[in-house]
């Protein structure tokens, strides 16, 4: 096979798929095999989590990141997020494991046995990186698949058993979403919101109607855009504006993935609707507000007048007013005054927290939930001795929110660097001055061996 070495491809073995830039068949094999690795990890890791799973303990105490995703989709859980059946977790793991074998076979086939280039095999699957019309057609197929993916969530929510709704009355429960939000003013209003504070841009979505309605919109938009890109050829301005090369497309993709990674970071850190706290543990603001509530309850039982007690700063010790006049929790948690959560909202009135409800109407389940969330804040250090930094070493808890937010932030940053790197190379190559490092006269080649 050609393009296995530096002489035939211009790239050394460690440059990986760069050797396959012009071998569409081999590149297909690499991508299908990569998909197989991804799906294999999903299946194997789900089964690993299930093998270690203790139904009596919260998922977030067991370091789980995959089973919570399955549970959020409404499989295997019931009222309050309690696991009622672990079999769906097993099924999801096995289905991914089996499909990864199919992908693995396809990847190996196209890497070893299949045609090196698809062009001589099929005009439909073949392509040339510089063929602008073919590239936008491929873009169209990708958009249609993404749209179908979005609509699959809609189908699960509306027709196949529903999703887990942490806001369901009487405590979270699996609920069929029968009335998704289709009003474009609501859906696109999220995109126009400020990203700061309680506004929170799209991350502020706090009900499943809006989530499912948004997926209906984005699914239909992606499918319509896909059909458009298949049927049309790029306009002159687009032909002139973009760089049309394999490396340019790589940079566009990395840029998009970077953006998605940063958005996912904010979602898993702040949003407790699509990442229910029953599965992922409390958000940072949630744990802080829960601590304020826990000690308010304790001191109120001991006789404190929580409505008028003054703290060491002269502000209210337990309750104070927000910048816009609502009654909020006092102390350091004041910065999280726009937190919303299903365990706290029943205590609100028309002007923030309702003093009458706080004095007379806090339910035992709210007290327990606040204490649980207070002690499971998403704090943690590198060596996994979690909890507050001053905590004794017997505490060993790191929230899945910490792991997921940190990993997605770091990966999103790496992808952003990769985007800039490949965009710069692609633009330089298009402008005709891209040289790279001259491998013939690379200094290291003339240096003596390290040993």
UniProtKB/Swiss-Prot annotation:
Membrane topology category: Multi-pass membrane protein
Residues engaged in binding chlorophyll a 8: 92
Source species: Thermostichus vulcanus (Synechococcus vulcanus)
Protein name: Photosystem II CP43 reaction center protein
Location in or out of the cell: Cellular thylakoid membrane
Role this protein plays: One of the components of the core complex of photosystem II (PSII). It binds chlorophyll and helps catalyze the primary light-induced photochemical processes of PSII. PSII is a light-driven water:plastoquinone oxidoreductase, using light energy to abstract electrons from H(2)O, generating O(2) and a proton gradient subsequently used for ATP formation.
Binding-site positions, chlorophyll a 13: 415
InterPro entries xrefs: PS_antenna-like (IPR000932), PS_II_antenna-like_sf (IPR036001), PSII_PsbC (IPR005869), PSII_PsbC_sf (IPR044900)
